Amino acid sequence: TAENLQLVADGRPGGRAATAEALDLFPVLREVSGRRAGLLSGGQRQQLAIARALITRPKLLLLDEPTEGIQPSVVTEIEETVLALTRRGGLGVLLVEQHVGFAMRAAQHYYVLEAGRVTSSGEGGTAAEQTVRTALSV
């Protein structure tokens, strides 16, 4: 796991600091730093993937179903991290997510797509959650 992160950080200006920041966001990765990535749980692998992306210091982070198939406690950890990243600023996040509550808490703007067409859009936040749930019939 540590080597996996180091591979991304090597040769990047500020790579070491970016790795430390990513590990601060996902402390469980410090605990499993000696394990091979293939031996991690699904949630740990997802956290590792997000950490690797953050080390590159992107302007836009693309997250496609980051909580799919992950146990609820790890879903909460990922949600808290994404919310912290969006609040901190300086990083755009494009999130595709089936957990409506998480998506709405993270969103500044939302779009509901059905069959490739936008069927609903608006400002994010928990106030819009019912609108989205109705549009999705959830």
Predicted regions and their residues:
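ABC-type ATPase nucleotide-binding domains, specifically the catalytic core motifs of the NBD
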Residues: 1-17, 25-30, 122
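Conserved ABC ATPase signature
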Residues: 36-40
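ABC ATPase C-loop
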Residues: 53-54
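Conserved catalytic motifs of ABC-family nucleotide-binding domains
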Residues: 57
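Catalytic Walker B motif of ABC-type/P-loop ATPase nucleotide-binding domains
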Residues: 61-65
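Helical segment within the ABC ATPase nucleotide-binding domain
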Residues: 75-89
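H-loop/switch region of ABC-family ATPase nucleotide-binding domains
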Residues: 97-98
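Conserved beta-strand-loop-alpha-helix hinge in the C-terminal portion
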Residues: 117-138
